[in-house]
Amino acid sequence: MSDTNPDCVIIGIAGASASGKSLIARTIYNELTAELGEDQIGVITEDCYYKDQSHLPMAERIKTNYDHPAAFDHALLAEHLKQLMAGKAVDIPTYSYSEHTRTDQTIRFTPKRIIILEGILLLNDSALRKLLNVSIFMDTPLDICLVRRLARDVQERGRTMDSVLEQYQKTVRPMFLQFIEPSKQYADIIIPRGGRNRIAIEMLKSRIRHLLLS
């Protein structure tokens, strides 16, 4: 908390893949945008900070353990957050799930009063935790996460069911148990029942309003 900026509220939402992080982030974004204006709030996804693998052949890229902390450039993410807190715009990288590497495009992100950051391993990184005003962990059962992940990755990311299940068994579940679930201890708020938990959403919105006024 020592590295936070009172003029910029950063909310970190962590938890297993397909636990409801993106849904609750979008819901809070949409509802607070209607209340405060779209120039006041923005969402950043940890997936954008997967490390560039363009120097590797595709056969090597697909072997990467994407659920391990080493797959992410958390140092760049932390630096971008610090720049945004200082009132400077940043160029966020974009990532291709089909190519397993970053694209050539970036997204210009201007400073906001509220930044919602969502990703599986946010609370595992001590440098990122220090930048968060509120840290949240989505405590959704793994079997529900797997069903959601299957539907998402097959329908939206062009994956096959077999490849999704193989990845889940080899890396997703083991990395959840090793890195993601233990990071729950750092959460200020633990949210059960996924991204449609209205009580949790209203509580978060109330907390954000309080931080903006304090």
UniProtKB/Swiss-Prot annotation:
Pathway assigned to this chain's UniProt record: Pyrimidine metabolism; CTP biosynthesis via salvage pathway; CTP from cytidine: step 1/3; Pyrimidine metabolism; UMP biosynthesis via salvage pathway; UMP from uridine: step 1/1
SUPFAM superfamilies (UniProt xref): P-loop containing nucleoside triphosphate hydrolases (SSF52540)
Asked whether the keyword Nucleotide-binding is assigned, the reply is yes
**Coiled-coil stretches noted in the UniProt entry, renumbered to this chain:** none
Q: Which residues bind ATP?
A: 15-22
Catalysed reaction per UniProt?
uridine + ATP = UMP + ADP + H(+); cytidine + ATP = CMP + ADP + H(+)
UniProt keyword annotations, A-Z:
ATP-binding, Cytoplasm, Kinase, Nucleotide-binding, Transferase
| Compartments where located | Cytoplasm
Q: What is its main location?
A: cytoplasm
Q: Does the keyword Transferase apply?
A: yes
GO annotations under biological process?
CTP salvage; UMP salvage
Highest taxon, organism lineage:
Bacteria
Cite the GO molecular-function annotations of the record: ATP binding; cytidine kinase activity; uridine kinase activity
> Which InterPro entries does the UniProt record give?
P-loop_NTPase (IPR027417), PRK/URK (IPR006083), Uridine_kinase (IPR026008), Uridine_kinase-like (IPR000764)
E.C. number: 2.7.1.48
According to the UniProt record, one GO cellular component term is: cytoplasm
Q: Which family does it belong to?
A: Belongs to the uridine kinase family.
Which named protein is this? Uridine kinase
